[in-house]
């Protein structure tokens, strides 16, 4: 029994350990496990199911009824009597324009839910990429601060040795010690940030990850955008999902005006029924006959609203105001998309420049450190200069790492704004990763 329990624990542990180690695998896991996406999917399915409910108003409505009664009186001719009956009724709408408008509105609302689901899929692509590269960035940061700490440790030991033989002052030892202590604090912070960054991935899939594929920096090369910002804006006008949601919302608001106006229109319904009632007379003083009464009727019902206290006119005005609000919301969304698009385009362009600049910065920092160390050896540079040069090198490497990830994410964000973001974009990014 104990072995079975331990085996169950092992199986449970394995089921929560993720085998996927790259961006694409984690995204595909998240597709089936991310609560935010699953919620949007369920809402979409419910919206499409509601179409069946709305369309049912245009189909026949059939009802079955039954009753039983017992009567006791103090009349001389009838003391007691019992009856039982059953009926079936049918009604069919012949003309109710509101039913057809409701069907159209419900279909548009289902389309809205479908667009919203697609929007959440794009959001999941971005959230997965952000969480993934947040981990890689935290790993790089930890690597660089550890390397900086190790370099400062060697400098501290060297400075201590130089002090011991009288080649430097005690202040240099204190400077080196302070720099090393600060680097140690940076390592502690970086380790904690890395641990916390993994939680972003677990939030998406519910699984834990130990190792991830890393960016292949040897093959990484930020390419300039092939199209101008106006071309990207045209794509956004046609494909931005938030913009499409607002367009559908405006169409629905317009139909709501027509729906409100149907309150003034006539309705025509077909009605039909079949019924049968059996009556049993008991203890009667008169000659009442027991028997069954059958009935059948077919009719057409016409209804024309004449006055409802102004309620219908009020509903029409409300719908008209809501249409104005929907129109303004569409315009607001368009302006927001336009601003986001141009900002996003500029961000990608700037990110390319940043990567190139930080690459040169690393080269320059390496040369500066070499020159500063040589100057320190001959006494033309101080220990402070050497410590600063060391920090500058690893800071430049850290900034270059962040710039690379920023470029990737800014490209994905631009594609989302344009409405073109899809799984293939993650496939392309994933192809630039290598085993960590």
Q: What residue ranges belong to the model's regions?
A:
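Gram-negative bacterial Sec-dependent N-terminal signal peptides
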Residues: 1-19
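Amphipathic alpha-helical coiled-coil scaffold segments and their short linker/junction regions
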Residues: 24-32, 173, 207-281, 424-436
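Transmembrane beta-barrel architecture of outer-membrane proteins
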Residues: 25, 83-85, 130, 175, ...
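A glycine-/polar-enriched beta->alpha junction
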Residues: 28-38, 45-60, 88-105, 115-122, ...
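Amphipathic alpha-helical coiled-coil segments
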Residues: 39-54, 120, 124-144, 154, ...
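Small/polar, glycine/serine/threonine/aspartate-rich low-complexity segments that form flexible
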Residues: 65-94, 102, 215-226, 258, ...
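Periplasmic alpha-helical coiled-coil/stalk elements that build and connect Gram-negative outer-membrane
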Residues: 123-237, 344-347, 351, 392-393
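Gram-negative outer-membrane assembly/targeting C-terminal domains
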Residues: 406-436
């Amino acid at each position: 029994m104990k072995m079975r329990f331990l085996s169950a624990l092992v199986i449970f542990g394995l089921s929560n350990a993720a085998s996927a180690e790259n961006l694409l695998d984690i995204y595909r896991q998240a597709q089936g496990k991310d609560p935010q996406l699953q919620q949007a999917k369920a809402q979409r399915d419910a919206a499409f199911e509601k179409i069946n409910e709305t369309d049912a108003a245009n189909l026949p409505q059939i009802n079955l009824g039954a009753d039983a009664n017992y009567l006791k009186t103090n009349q001389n001719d009838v003391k007691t009597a019992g009856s039982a009956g059953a009926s079936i009724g049918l009604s069919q709408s012949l003309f109710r324009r509101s039913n057809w408008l409701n069907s159209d509105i419900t279909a548009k609302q289902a389309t809205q839910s479908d667009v919203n689901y697609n929007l959440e899929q794009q959001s999941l692509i971005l959230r997965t990429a952000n969480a993934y590269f947040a981990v890689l960035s935290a790993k790089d940061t930890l690597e660089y601060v550890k390397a900086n700490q190790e370099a400062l440790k060697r400098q501290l030991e060297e400075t201590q040795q130089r002090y011991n033989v009288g080649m430097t002052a005690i202040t240099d030892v204190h400077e080196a010690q302070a720099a090393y202590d600060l680097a140690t604090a940076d390592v502690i912070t970086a380790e904690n940030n890395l641990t916390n960054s993994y939680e972003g991935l677990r939030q998406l899939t519910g699984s834990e990850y130990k190792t991830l594929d890393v960016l292949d920096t040897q093959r990484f090369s930020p390419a300039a955008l092939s199209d101008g910002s106006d071309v990207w804006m045209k794509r956004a006008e046609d494909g931005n999902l938030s913009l499409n949601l607002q367009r559908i919302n405006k169409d629905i608001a317009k139909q709501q005006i027509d729906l409100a106006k149907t309150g003034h229109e006539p309705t025509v319904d077909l009605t039909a029924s079949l019924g049968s009632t059996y009556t049993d007379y008991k203890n009667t003083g008169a000659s009442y006959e027991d028997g069954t009464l059958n009935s059948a009727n077919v009719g057409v019902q016409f209804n024309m609203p004449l006055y409802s206290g102004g309620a219908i006119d009020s509903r029409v005005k409300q719908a008209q105001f809501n249409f104005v609000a929907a129109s303004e919301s569409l315009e607001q969304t368009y302006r927001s998309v336009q601003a986001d698009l141009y900002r996003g385009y500029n961000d990608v362009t700037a990110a390319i420049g940043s990567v190139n600049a930080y690459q040169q910065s690393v080269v320059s920092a390496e040369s500066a450190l070499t020159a500063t160390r040589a100057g320190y050896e001959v006494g033309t540079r101080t220990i402070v200069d050497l410590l600063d040069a060391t920090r500058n090198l690893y800071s430049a490497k850290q900034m270059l790492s962040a710039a690379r990830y920023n470029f990737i994410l800014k490209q994905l964000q631009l594609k989302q704004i344009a409405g073109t973001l899809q799984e293939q974009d993650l496939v392309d990014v994933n192809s630039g990763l290598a085993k960590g």
